[in-house]
């Protein structure tokens, strides 16, 4: 094993990278509330893992979606646990995100030179809420159906472009298969990809600028 490590060390300088990560200065004023962002990241990772597991059994069609959820909950080994963890971690992610935003705002972490870090954080907050909106509809039960109908109907109040926006969100004039397909694609591909990109930007800026000082 030593020779294998030395081979990689010679080419990648793993020890230097590890030293840089572990030797970063942490200000003395940092407390447990500064961990809220990391907890949010942990919830996102749990979401990705459990969500990926459910894609093996979930069927994104209006006729089979609800039945596939029932199958996951009653027939798949530990399916009930995987889906429950997915739901619990989703709620936890939203809660931790809100608390993290409050902590950053109250401690002035959005001020110069960290404006871009704050902006990427706001984008991540919007993406987090979008996860909730799109994921809520996927079981395609009565609650999910009417939630989608209400949410996608909101833009209709916008003058001129309202009807076009509603049709864009739904995929057609009314809520149906096209709507479920779009929400499933957003929830499982578009939103996770955007979230991963903005999280990377967010953490790289935090790494570069360090943790903000006390007020």
Curated annotation (Swiss-Prot):
Keyword Metal-binding among record annotations: yes
Keywords: Chloroplast, Electron transport, Heme, Iron, Membrane, Metal-binding, Photosynthesis, Plastid, Thylakoid, Transmembrane, Transmembrane helix, Transport
Signal sequence segment: none
Binding site for heme b 2: 86, 187
Positions of heme b 1 binding: 100, 202
CC cofactor: heme b; heme c
Membrane topology listed for this record: Multi-pass membrane protein
A single Gene Ontology CC term: chloroplast thylakoid membrane
GO molecular function: electron transporter, transferring electrons within cytochrome b6/f complex of photosystem II activity; metal ion binding; oxidoreductase activity
Role summary: Component of the cytochrome b6-f complex, which mediates electron transfer between photosystem II (PSII) and photosystem I (PSI), cyclic electron flow around PSI, and state transitions.
Record's miscellaneous remark: Heme 1 (or BH or b566) is high-potential and absorbs at about 566 nm, and heme 2 (or BL or b562) is low-potential and absorbs at about 562 nm.
Family from the record: Belongs to the cytochrome b family. PetB subfamily.
Official protein name in the record: Cytochrome b6
Gene behind this protein: petB
């Amino acid at each position: 094993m030593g020779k294998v490590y030395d081979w990689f060390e010679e080419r990648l300088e793993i020890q230097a990278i590890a030293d840089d990560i572990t030797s970063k200065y942490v200000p003395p004023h940092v407390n447990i509330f500064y961990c809220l962002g990391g907890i949010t990241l942990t919830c996102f990772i749990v979401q990705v893992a459990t969500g990926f597991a459910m894609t093996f059994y979930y069927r994104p069609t209006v006729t089979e979606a609800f039945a596939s959820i029932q199958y996951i909950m009653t027939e798949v080994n530990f399916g009930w646990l995987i889906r429950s963890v997915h739901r619990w971690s989703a709620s936890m992610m939203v809660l931790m995100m809100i608390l993290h935003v409050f902590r950053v705002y109250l401690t002035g972490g959005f001020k110069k030179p960290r404006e871009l870090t704050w902006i990427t954080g706001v984008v991540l907050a919007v993406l987090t809420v979008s996860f909730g909106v799109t994921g809520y509809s996927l079981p395609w039960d009565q609650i999910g159906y009417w939630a989608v109908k209400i949410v996608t109907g909101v833009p209709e109040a916008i003058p001129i472009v309202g009807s076009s926006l509603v049709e864009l969100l739904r995929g057609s004039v009314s809520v149906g298969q096209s709507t479920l397909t779009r929400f499933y694609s957003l929830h499982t591909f578009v939103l996770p990809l955007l979230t991963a990109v903005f999280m990377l930007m967010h953490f790289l800026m935090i790494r570069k600028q360090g943790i903000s000082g006390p007020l």
